[in-house]
C-alpha cells in the first residue's frame, strides 16, 4: 500500500445489517473490490463487495457481526484476504482467514498468498491424459481419475462417502507421497470433528491441511472457505507436487453465494440463485487444474437438492466434472464397500485411447455382465435360479463374483473391520477382472471374492473355505 493510502486509510462504519457492513472513507481512499478491511475494535475482517459512491464501500463480514456499531474505525489493508501456505499448514485445522482453530498455536510460516488470483494461463496448462492410480479396484477399473481432473462424489448419508475420501487421502499420502487439502464448505461442525479424529487415528493427518467454513458461520466464511483451501493446494502444486483436493460440499458454495447476493440486494436468477452463479463456479473450478509443474485432482461431494439434477447448482457443477462416482445405498445394503455403483458411475478417462484397449474392454465386459445380471434379477426373484438357461446361470455366477470382488478392505477402516487394508495396482486389477470375466475362476465359491485385495488373496481364501 502506498504512503498516501496509509495516511488516510481509516474509515468508519455507517451501517450494519447482519453480515453486510457499510464503511465510509474519504473519497480518494475507497477500498477496491475484494480488498480486505479490518475493524480496529475486534479485528473483524470485512471483504469489500461494492462501492456505493460518496466514499462508501459495502462489504461482507468474515465473522460474527455482533457488537458492531456505527462510528467504529475500520482500516484498509490494501490487499485481498491472504492465508498461510506451505508445509506448516499440514496437520492443522484453519478457518477461512487461515487462522488455526485446533488449539495448537499459530501456523508457523511467513509464506502467505491472496485467496483471489487468476486461473493458470493457457500456455501453462498441461495437456496430460495421465490416469491417477488410487489403489481402489472399482475406481481404477470403471471410473479412473484423471491427474488434474475433477470428480463428483454423489452419495447420501451413511453410504461411505467420508471413508472413501479418507482412503483416497491415505493412498495419495502413502503410495504417492502426496499431500491433500480438505475444504469443508458449509460443513457440520460434528462431521468436521469426526473427520479430524478419524484421520488422526489413521495416521495421515500430517499429510493433509483442513479448512472449515462451518454451517453456523456467516455466509462470507462459507463462500470463501473453498478458495482458502484451493489457495493452499495451488501452492503445493506450484512446488511440483500432485495434490488431492476435497470439497465437501460443493453445493453449499453457490448456496452461500446466493445468501451473499441476496444480502447485497442483487436481482435473483432462476430458483432464487445469484445471477453470477456460473461465473462464481467457473472462478473456483478453473483454478483446479494441472500445469506443467504439478497437478490438483479434486474430489467434490455433490448434494443434489430434491434429487433434481436440473437444479441450477448441480447443473452448473456437472459442466466442470470429468468423472462422477455414484455411491449406492442398494450396494451398501449388500455389505459391499466401497458402495460404488459400477453402472451409474462414469469417467471421461475410460477411453481406449487414454487407458488402453485392454483396460477399456475389461471394464466394459464387467459392466455388460453386471447389467445383464440386473436385468435377470426380477426373473430370479419371481421364478428362482432354476428357471434360467445354463448360459444365464453361468453369467449370474460370474456377475456375483465381479460384484463381490469390487469390494475391498480399506486401511482407514481397519479399526472397525479388523481386516488389513489393501492397495491394488491397476495392472493387477485388470488382470484379475479379465480372468473372472473369461471364466478362469468359475470353480471358486463367490464368498472367496468378498473383501479381498488381489486375486491371489481370493485364491487363498477359497482354499481356506474348502479346508474349513
UniProtKB/Swiss-Prot annotation:
Localization: Cell inner membrane
Membrane topology summary: Peripheral membrane protein
EC id: 7.1.2.2
Positions contributing to ATP binding: 155-162
GO CC list: plasma membrane; proton-transporting ATP synthase complex
Keywords carried by this UniProt record: ATP synthesis, ATP-binding, Cell inner membrane, Cell membrane, CF(1), Hydrogen ion transport, Ion transport, Membrane, Nucleotide-binding, Translocase, Transport
Keyword Chloroplast carried by entry: no
Catalytic activity: ATP + H2O + 4 H(+)(in) = ADP + phosphate + 5 H(+)(out)
Main subcellular localisation: membrane
A Pfam family of this chain: ATP-synt_ab_N
One MF term in the entry's GO annotations: ATP binding
Enzyme category, top tier: translocase
Record-linked InterPro entries: AAA+_ATPase, ATP-synt_VA_C, ATP_synth_F1_bsu, ATPase_a/bsu_AS, ATPase_alpha/beta_chains, ATPase_F1/V1/A1_a/bsu_N, ATPase_F1/V1/A1_a/bsu_N_sf, ATPase_F1/V1/A1_a/bsu_nucl-bd
HAMAP family (UniProt xref): ATP_synth_beta_bact
Family: Belongs to the ATPase alpha/beta chains family.
Subunit note: F-type ATPases have 2 components, CF(1) - the catalytic core - and CF(0) - the membrane proton channel. CF(1) has five subunits: alpha(3), beta(3), gamma(1), delta(1), epsilon(1). CF(0) has three main subunits: a(1), b(2) and c(9-12). The alpha and beta chains form an alternating ring which encloses part of the gamma chain. CF(1) is attached to CF(0) by a central stalk formed by the gamma and epsilon chains, while a peripheral stalk is formed by the delta and b chains.
Main function: Produces ATP from ADP in the presence of a proton gradient across the membrane. The catalytic sites are hosted primarily by the beta subunits.
Protein name: ATP synthase subunit beta
Gene designation per UniProt: atpD
